[in-house]
Amino acid sequence: MSEANAGTNAKTDVVLVGAGIMSATLGTLIKLLEPNWSITMIERLDGAAAESSDPWNNAGTGHSALCELNYTPALPDGTIDISKAVNVNEQFQVSRQFWAHAVENGVLPDVRSFLNPVPHVSFVYGADNVQYLKARYNALVTNPLFASMEFIDDKDEFTRRLPLMAEKRDFSEPVALNWSQHGTDVDFGSLSRQLIGFAAGNGMTTMFGHDVRDLSKNSDGSWTVKVRNRRTGNNFKINAKFVFVGAGGGALPLLQKSGIPEAKGFGGFPVGGAFLRTNKQHLTSRHNAKVYGLPPLGAPPMSVPHLDTRVINGRQWLLFGPFAGWSPKFLKQGKVTDLPLSVKPNNLASMLGVGLTEVGLLKYLIGQLLLSEPARVETLREFAPSAVDSDWELDIAGQRVQVIRRKGAGGVLEFGTTVLAAADGSIAGLLGASPGASTAVPAMLDVLQRCFADRYQAWTPKLKEMVPSLGTKLSDEPKLFEEVWSWGTKVLKLDVQANTAEAANAPATV
């Protein structure tokens, strides 16, 4: 569909709003299931995956709960609750299987540009924290999904595996690691672009530099999508049977405009992020891992500090952060009016309720905003004691819009990803952040099941080709897990170290 003929009578089966990982995944799934359906993707920026899916705008961990300590809280009796970690990892396994199927079938032609083997590591110091990490290891290692995890509290082994973090470290204070060798670094920008390339090559229309201005429901259950060309100012309409709003932080305002009751009461709280980064070879060659620590006292889950190996455009980088920022924008390239305009009569109580109850978050944000450049590097020295200010530069990352959900007379801030769908299945959208991109495949399968309930059963055999474990908890099926894991590892070339990364266990000198 060209803009010239996209007048009031232009029709499409599916409109995807946004060209990030969620829309890219859903568009590909639909093209594989229903090749003849017409799909139109509308993106306000001039390129795909330029907001939260861009590798510089997210951590690229491919959240699999191997190293993120906020997924394994200690209970008052000292035991570790691993339920959230298992749930997140189960979701990541679904995405991993789909990516393997896509590589095997030519949907994703360049696996190494978006997926690289990088160990995932949890790091703590101090006797009490070491005790917690040992308990975490004992709780997780009995689960098939985490069975290969190692516990390391030996100074020499720590130094061998993480030479940069060992340099100038005072080992008189106990340290410990949970080491998961089979982690990955994911470039969700490259992954999104390849998925969109496949869908576009199979008939999907892409409209970049176009803004969705409004959505209105028609009497026949379809939607009229009002679109503006940001370059020419030309306005036009598209009629769609189904609309998916995958516009990242821009999803909430559009879902509010749709008027669906399911969106009522929801609000959004934008949190910015920044990382210190370096590509200096004398640093990148001595650190090959994503190392996550404990969040500062009173800080929200998205503030967990981590020192990460990233592989972006074939080059190895180190990123440390996140450092929180604040802006009323819902997108990195959004407007300062995004937050105030999102406040509606139906979510005002939710928004005010969060403002009154999340005092810890507000204190944390204020403290982060006051950090100087030297203070940021000082925080980095908890991980890399030898860090030198001049080796690192600041990267302003993307905006995260955390979900505010109605609770009682007020509201509660949620840290997670929420799929909203209308009761009739004609429109759906995605809100929230972590674990976000790495759960794109299960999230979009959820959209398909909820919005195309009449077709989902007929699609299931094809979906099981794409995700062999579909509908099965792999943590309950060790044999099936081993089969799909081995297959995925081979197809995704994760058994071969990337040229750009140093071998994780190579002997190192400090």
Swiss-Prot record:
Enzyme Commission number(s) from the entry: 1.1.5.4
GO BP, one annotated term: tricarboxylic acid cycle
Enzyme class: oxidoreductase
Pathway note: Carbohydrate metabolism; tricarboxylic acid cycle; oxaloacetate from (S)-malate (quinone route): step 1/1
Cofactor(s) for this UniProt protein: FAD
Gene3D superfamilies: FAD/NAD(P)-binding domain
Any Pfam family hit: Mqo
Signal peptide extent: none
Catalytic activity: (S)-malate + a quinone = a quinol + oxaloacetate
Keyword field: FAD, Flavoprotein, Oxidoreductase, Tricarboxylic acid cycle
Transmembrane portions of the chain: none
Keyword presence, Flavoprotein: yes
Molecular function (Gene Ontology), one example: L-malate dehydrogenase (quinone) activity
Record bears the keyword Cytoplasm: no
InterPro entries reported for this sequence: FAD/NAD-bd_sf, MQO
Family: Belongs to the MQO family.
Protein's name according to its UniProt entry: Probable malate:quinone oxidoreductase
Species lineage: Bacteria, Bacillati, Actinomycetota, Actinomycetes, Mycobacteriales
Underlying gene: mqo
